[in-house]
């Protein structure tokens, strides 16, 4: 055989073997998933116990004029119950035609019906299956108001020249743009063909080719099986910059260089996580910086994290977002919550991993600051939540799963894992986590499955240590156990001392040594300042103005004898001997540090929140600009809530919201509509 011929045959053989390995991998994953007992998912109409979707082939035309996706979804199915129909989740989809086939060709029309719509769940699409049907083809289009899509005019983008569209599928919004089994219990592989205006680029949570020509016709393949909420699409005027051998960033041309500089440590983060928890199993890890209306800080879409531009601080101080979304490549994407009441399995693990990544890349001090801020966030949330919403294994029956997205699954979940780490030792707990990710890789699991694995592979090894961790209290009870870890930061102690000196009049604001402060130190400084208390705060936090948990609550809540409760968002971290912050002192800080005009989103948010409470009017124009220019729910919801506490504030909030509402994502609109009782 000639060398050239041998090389061609070798390449063919290699390609064939790769495809066989991929097929075997998908079959193994499918078999493993089917072997797990199905948990009831109250947020899906689908029936995967009878008919399970294995693979999707998607084909869309993207119409910016009509604000719709129009095309076809072909579903490859496994018939576990030959008598059962296929039931899919939809929300405001226009179903034109449904066909079935035994072979993937020669499709014939089959009967289908769309059931009555529910405000939260959408409507079931029930499809009658012929005896030998293995493929279902659905011709459909989306609605211009689809909750999982946002269509942006050029004026809403950084470049101001081209429109932009992006999806947000978590928790149950995939059904608004794809007819599918919209439950995290079902994992699918997929391909897609996307046609767009020729000058725009389409990217997906799939294999993206960084150097693909912008020709308006794009093809994608996702070989790893993912749940529906991790299917993602974006279309816009995008450029790419490489960050490392398998990492990069997409963004609008006027943003991409700034984003590349901000995220330049991404490859280091991937390597650090692999050293801790095993190989990265998704091929490439890229980021996409979206326009500012994106409702979240980030979304962990596999292979392509969607990120808010509000983290582009210029000093890498907010890249904990990257660490968080990267960590999801292990916790959430690799091992997934089976239902949305198990959400803490995604987010609590991810916050814990995020801080371990930050420590590995930036040092222990950074981790300590992030953990201390996280504990503060958790305590603030616990001050306002009902007991039923303080539970990790939360009951969301009859509720929108987005309602479970407080700091509880994130910070309480991470604190529970920190408790396990501190009790059993970091080295032992790291080995446990690595084995956990390997054991449940590419599966969706319940809280009970995790607890069984925890008992068998960690707790039972040392009953005396296990007795120190009240697992049931962490998982099923409100509040925080009394022996929970209490993360502290020596850097924050120094910040508090400077705040005290200024408030006591020992130094002027301009003399506070802030030159080397990080964003985290600035945020802690502002949070530690004593603010006037509103009525709601007094109800929850009578007599407690320290940074420690209140021993008991007055008013509507009573502390359980075995747990700590929380102080309110307005509390300070200083002692009672300092004065309450007022308009004059706000003005002094503003003059010294120009906080009203801060371009750092975290600092600006905290300052504006304080300005509303103190009625610091010089910040009001910036407040309006902030609320109109970004749609990140983490920032805008608390600001509207604070405004709505007074009649004049609510009037201001409504005036701003009238301007901002058309630019917000549907997820943010739903949240603010509720805050302001918008009609």
Describe the function of each predicted region.
Residues 21-30:
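Bacterial N-terminal signal peptides
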Residues 17, 72, 103-106, 220, ...:
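Hydrophobic alpha-helical and helix-loop surface patches within well-folded domains
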Residues 1-10, 554-557:
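Short, basic, low-complexity termini and linkers enriched in Ser/Thr/Gly/Pro
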